């Protein structure tokens, strides 16, 4: 379902995630150093607290919205998420076509196809305007947040258990962390927060769109087509075997 959301271009897709905690310790990175004189990091570690990162990412444009925080409780995450989503919705054009209630409900239910456990949709639904990919965390399933998303025309798409790799926000968070922290030794959580948000602002000056699958996926699919699966296990051969052929 999430892969289908990435592939379509009718509804905007945003992804949400949290990264961290990041500690006040040296982060390894790449340096130019004279031969025999490697970079030396301080061995002392003073516990000054940690920082986390809240992320909203739009793969189609590459735009990212980031906020650094000390804690990531629902009381902190939900208001930030709601404010950012309202700003995103305000920038979207109003739906050009007015659908009947039945057609509108089918648009929402289309994104629940194939799920074994489905969230109950409200009786009255606004026009569907945005798809939001979220990790399957308890904080993302609170009734107040889910009902707010529905009221705003946002359909949450939750990653399955062990399926966080379906959330493209994971990739942008890894990139921003490397740009912000690698090769540095932050002394305070506030310094970590400032560097993470600065890295996001720098990224947004020239964002790079993300695409699902791409050339690597096409190569993997071609490789699988050249393989011949065997029964009984996950084994395969590079040429077909005829079951009636004698050894």
Model region roles, listed by residue range:
Residues 14-16, 130-135, 157-160, 211-214:
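Short beta-strand segments
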């Amino acid at each position: 379902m999430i892969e289908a959301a990435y592939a379509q271009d009718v509804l905007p897709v945003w992804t949400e995630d949290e990264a961290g905690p990041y500690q006040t310790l040296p982060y390894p990175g790449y340096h130019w150093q004279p031969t025999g004189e490697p970079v030396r990091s301080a061995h002392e570690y003073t516990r000054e607290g940690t920082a986390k990162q809240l992320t909203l990412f739009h793969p189609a444009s590459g735009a990212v919205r980031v906020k650094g925080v000390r804690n990531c409780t629902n009381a902190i995450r939900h208001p930030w998420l709601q404010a950012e989503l309202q700003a995103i919705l305000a920038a979207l054009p109003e739906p050009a076509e007015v659908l009947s209630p039945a057609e509108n409900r089918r648009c929402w239910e289309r994104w629940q196809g194939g799920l074994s456990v489905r969230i109950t949709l409200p009786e009255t639904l606004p026009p569907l305007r945005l798809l939001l990919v979220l990790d399957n965390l308890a904080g993302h399933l609170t009734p107040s947040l889910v009902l707010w998303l529905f009221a705003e025309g946002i359909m949450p798409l939750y990653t399955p258990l062990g399926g966080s790799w379906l959330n493209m926000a994971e990739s942008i968070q890894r990139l921003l962390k490397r740009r912000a922290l690698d090769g540095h030794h932050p002394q305070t959580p506030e310094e970590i927060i400032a560097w993470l948000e600065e890295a996001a602002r720098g990224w947004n000056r020239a964002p790079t769109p993300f695409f699902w699958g791409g050339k690597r996926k096409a190569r993997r699919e071609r490789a699988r087509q050249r393989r011949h699966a065997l029964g009984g296990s996950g084994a395969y051969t590079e040429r077909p075997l005829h079951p009636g052929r004698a050894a």
